Swiss-Prot record:
The lineage of its organism: Eukaryota, Metazoa, Chordata, Craniata, Vertebrata. This is Snaclec coagulation factor IX/factor X-binding protein subunit B2. GO terms for cellular component: extracellular region. InterPro entries: C-type_lectin-like (IPR001304), C-type_lectin-like/link_sf (IPR016186), C-type_lectin/snaclec_domain (IPR050111), C-type_lectin_CS (IPR018378), CTDL_fold (IPR016187). Pfam families: Lectin_C (PF00059). Anticoagulant protein which binds to the gamma-carboxyglutamic acid-domain regions of factors IX (F9) and factor X (F10) in the presence of calcium with a 1 to 1 stoichiometry.
């Protein structure tokens, strides 16, 4: 009886320690601060990339950065996965011509502009944002909250 309680307690500890970690992410996705991320080496325009992300998981969108630490994590992940490339993120003015917003409707709090235009991408070699026509093709990073 004591052994059963000990084993049950041990399993409970393991389960609780995995909560909110990569165990909550799909296979091939990486976890950071309660979110799962995956860079995709597929060239898509911004709208097609956003649509693809929404189909990957409930609540999925192109990545949105809420802090420099989160951005550093994703930039490093993208570089380690594919090397030098550019990646769409969820920031655009597609829906409101003058108001930038993340594709998941989060407020824009953290900024790292290099220049302005339509849809925003980042280079996997640094954390500098650039904009370009949303019709251009780029790789992308999807994100969902666990």
């Amino acid at each position: 009886m004591g052994r059963l309680i000990f084993v049950s307690f041990g399993l409970l500890v393991v389960f609780l320690s995995l909560s909110g970690t990569a165990a909550d992410c799909l296979s091939g996705w990486s976890s950071y601060e309660g979110h799962c991320y995956k860079p995709f080496n597929e060239l898509k325009n911004w709208a097609d990339a956003e649509n693809f992300c929404t189909q990957q998981h409930a609540g999925g969108h192109l990545v949105s950065f809420q802090s420099s630490e989160e951005a550093d994590f994703v930039v490093k992940l993208a570089f380690e996965t594919f090397g030098h490339s550019i990646f769409w993120m969820g920031l655009s003015n597609v829906w409101n011509q003058c108001n930038w917003q993340w594709s998941n409707a989060a407020m824009l709090r953290y900024k790292a502009w290099a220049e302005e235009s339509y849809c925003v991408y980042f280079k996997s070699t640094n954390n500098k944002w650039r904009s370009r026509s949303c019709r251009m093709m780029a790789n992308f990073v999807c994100e969902f909250q666990v």
